[in-house]
Amino acid sequence: MEELIAKRYLKAIKQGSNAESMREIALIFSILSEAFNDKKFIQIINNPDVSRDQKSEILLAAVKSAGYKEVENLIKLLAEHNRIEIIPAIAEVMRKDIAKTNRVYSGVVYSDSVVDSKVMEDLGNGLGSRFNSKISLKFVKDNFNGIKVDVEDLGVEISFSKARINTQMIEHIIKAI
């Protein structure tokens, strides 16, 4: 639900912004969304004793130095309609939209053994050429017996399981005999 509402706000922001200002606004919202990881901040935002104007002033003080009237007006609008809690969703929708526009994505490689950086680069380049985009991959050590590549924004997940490959090889050998 939050994502649908965030997309509406994104559409409005995109109409009045160019690509460079979109990146800067996305950065501002990304930083604001990090504040929602702080329990004390969430207590203040969810506290019914704190007025909408006070919540708005707290957020406006955080973004005042950026000097974007659009951001300030959006924060006032969000506070007015009690939608401050969707700021992280707006930040995520903006990040995905910018990635889609620039065709630059990030993904994760999961494996139980260390994957060489050259292999990671080759995987990223191969996937990037397949999807006509630039994909950067980072490694996460996991208990997955094989290699799994996940590029969430593209909706791509590729996995190579050692057990499955062994099973397929055995089946192929049995068929050959």
Swiss-Prot record:
Topology of the protein relative to the lipid bilayer: Peripheral membrane protein
Molecular-function annotations in GO: proton-transporting ATP synthase activity, rotational mechanism
Keyword Cell inner membrane attributed: yes
Location of the protein in the cell: Cell inner membrane
Coiled-coil stretches: none
Listed Gene3D superfamilies: N-terminal domain of the delta subunit of the F1F0-ATP synthase
Record-annotated disulphide pairs: none
A single Gene Ontology CC term: plasma membrane
Keywords carried by this UniProt record: ATP synthesis, Cell inner membrane, Cell membrane, CF(1), Hydrogen ion transport, Ion transport, Membrane, Transport
Pfam families named in the record: OSCP
Quaternary context: F-type ATPases have 2 components, F(1) - the catalytic core - and F(0) - the membrane proton channel. F(1) has five subunits: alpha(3), beta(3), gamma(1), delta(1), epsilon(1). F(0) has three main subunits: a(1), b(2) and c(10-14). The alpha and beta chains form an alternating ring which encloses part of the gamma chain. F(1) is attached to F(0) by a central stalk formed by the gamma and epsilon chains, while a peripheral stalk is formed by the delta and b chains.
Function as written in the Swiss-Prot or TrEMBL entry: F(1)F(0) ATP synthase produces ATP from ADP in the presence of a proton or sodium gradient. F-type ATPases consist of two structural domains, F(1) containing the extramembraneous catalytic core and F(0) containing the membrane proton channel, linked together by a central stalk and a peripheral stalk. During catalysis, ATP synthesis in the catalytic domain of F(1) is coupled via a rotary mechanism of the central stalk subunits to proton translocation.
Family: Belongs to the ATPase delta chain family.
NCBIfam families xref list: PRK08474.1
Matching HAMAP family: ATP_synth_delta_bact
Official protein name in the record: ATP synthase subunit delta
Organism field: Sulfurimonas denitrificans (strain ATCC 33889 / DSM 1251)
The gene coding this protein: atpH
